[in-house]
Amino acid sequence: IQTAHEAFQITRKVPSWKRTEVLEKVSEGIKANREKFARAIALEAGKPIQSARAEVDRAVFTFKIASEEARRIYGEIVPLDWLPGNENRIAHIRRVPRGPVIGITPFNYPLNLVAHKVAPAIAAGNPIIVRPATQTPVSSFLLAQVVLEAGWTPGGMQVVPTKTSDAKPFV
């Protein structure tokens, strides 16, 4: 958790164009290692290879969509004319990274459900700690390697495989 807080001091300052670039590289990295990911999923989750490949393809898409959304984290302009004398006042709301995120995932989609936690966290500029299912941690480790190679901050994605009882302090 301390490492994630330290990484947050960096990730919170990463501009949206850079987060977009990292997410695109993650998408490309997963696609380039499609068979490696599919074999890992098939072996650790017991899925047929075709289903595992479909899951990898979905994760590629998830990171691609997140790369596009990283550009669209807008703020809002809110009128403050609720009281007399405030007719010409407005508030500007800016969306900013909040801090480390914990992603706890089940075993049935060991890559795609992790991707659905990691991609939005990166898009928003937050570090993430992933606690994968004890039965299926390998694809999370493979993904963490791709994320690091894509240029995300060291410590910005961590994988902590633990028993459920040991994960309670994270919650």
Where on the chain are the PLM-derived regions?
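Glycine-rich loop-to-alpha-helix module at the N-terminal edge of alpha/beta enzyme cores
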Residues: I1-Y74
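Rossmann-like NAD(P) dinucleotide-binding subdomain of oxidoreductase/dehydrogenase enzymes
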Residues: G75-V171
